[in-house]
Curated annotation (Swiss-Prot):
HAMAP family in alphabetical order: TIM_B
Variant or mutagenesis effect after changing W168A: Reduced IgE-binding activity by approximately 30% compared to wild-type, but still induces human basophil activation
Binding partners and assembly: Homodimer.
Superkingdom, taxonomy of origin: Eukaryota
Name the record gives this protein: Triosephosphate isomerase
Catalytic reaction(s) noted: D-glyceraldehyde 3-phosphate = dihydroxyacetone phosphate; dihydroxyacetone phosphate = methylglyoxal + phosphate
Main location: cytoplasm
The family this protein is said to belong to: Belongs to the triosephosphate isomerase family.
Localization of this protein: Cytoplasm
Amino acid sequence: MANQRKFFVGGNWKMNGDKAAIDGIISFMKGPLNADTEVVVGCPQCYLMYTREHMPANIGVAAQNCYKTAKGAFTGEISPAMIKDCGCEWVILGHSERRNVFGEPDQLISEKVGHALEAGLKVIPCIGEKLEERESNRTEEVVFAQMKALVPNISDWSRVVIAYEPVWAIGTGKTATPEQAQDVHAKLRQWLRDNVSPQVAESTRIIYGGSVSAGNCKELAKTGDIDGFLVGGASLKPDFVTIINARA
């Protein structure tokens, strides 16, 4: 079934870039890119329209966050409806920086995911453990709790791509070994099988994030339960094309 799950590579630009930098990214995103890989880039919200208008049409564009309602007195927030109005179809939610820098709890993230799906967006919910949680053998406890919070608000699993990102590996240069990453992905898939359905477990893409690079992507892509990547800093550089083509 792994071969039936389309390989997925997302780029999370975080709070980086300006129009000139985006133009540079667009120039190398013309590829060639593996046609069997779905590609989405997550850009700062002020550049959603610019990126969508200039990025090749075969590449999706995602917001990096949104709120849980369509409109209202929520200064500084954007809604799924606004993201769609900019011509974009995707949103990244629950990234570890939203959880750990901005203090977003599991329940809020779940509500955001639910509203985004209701509004018609496709969603990349992020989960993952911190270093102290891994070192105290709590990885499964943490990621399963994060998944349990998400499930009640997921109305359409076909529009969900789960991103497992161990927090200790994000931007640190440390990467989970292919064996470590595959182990967590396999356990997450079994959790879906046990707590949602076998069909959802087999069809849902679970991607890996955490210092993915041109140097390690091919080994990570060979594993049975890693269905792609969510890439941070490397998505701003031409190496991103190598990562997209990891299974080429």
